A protein has these predicted regions:
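Amide-donor transfer/coupling interface in amidating biosynthetic enzymes
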Residues: 1-135
Length: 135
C-alpha cells in the first residue's frame, strides 16, 4: 500500500509528496534538510525530547497520506509529531506498546557517540525497563 513500490496501488497509505508528483526526473528533489516538528504532550516523543517543538533532518520524497490518517488513529495509532506548515505526519506511536515510535526523519543523523539522540536514549531506557523492571 505504498506508491513507492506500486504507483498504481489502490490504497496509497504511503504516497509521494504532492510537491514531488509532477517532477519526472527525481534526482536530488527529495525533502532534504532540517524541518520543524510539533509534538503532542503525553507522548513518548514528547517524553524523549522534553519539549514541544523540535527540528530533525529529512531525506525522502514519500509521506503518510493524510487521507488515511483518521482511520489509523481510530485503530490506536497516535500521530505524535507533525510538520504544521505542510501538514505532514512526522512521528507515530502505538500507545499500548512499551515503546513503538516510528519517525519520518532520520534521528541517526543527529546522534553522536557522546551525545545520543533523545529517541535512542528513550528506546534503550525502555528496553532496560522492559527487561529489568526499572532503569
Amino acid at each position: 500500500n505504498s506508491s513507492e513500490f506500486d504507483d498504481k496501488t489502490k490504497y496509497p497509505v504511503i504516497d509521494i509528496m504532492s510537491s514531488q508528483k509532477k517532477i519526472k526526473k527525481k534526482g536530488a528533489t527529495m525533502r532534504l534538510g532540517s524541518y520543524g516538528c510539533n509534538l503532542i504532550g503525553k507522548s513518548k516523543a514528547y517524553e524523549s525530547y522534553g519539549k514541544r517543538k523540535i527540528n530533525e533532518r529529512h531525506r525522502h520524497r514519500f509521506e503518510v497520506n493524510n487521507k488515511y490518517r483518521s482511520k489509523f488513529e481510530a485503530k490506536g495509532l497516535v500521530v505524535s509529531g507533525t510538520n504544521k506548515e505542510l501538514n505532514l505526519v512526522e512521528i507515530v506511536e502505538i500507545k499500548s506498546h512499551p515503546w513503538f515510535v516510528a519517525t519520518q526523519f532520520h534521528p541517526e543523523l543527529k546522534s553522536r557517540v557522546v551525545n545520543a539522540h533523545p529517541l535512542f536514549k528513550s528506546f534503550v531506557g525502555a528496553c532496560i525497563k522492559q527487561k529489568y523492571g526499572h532503569l
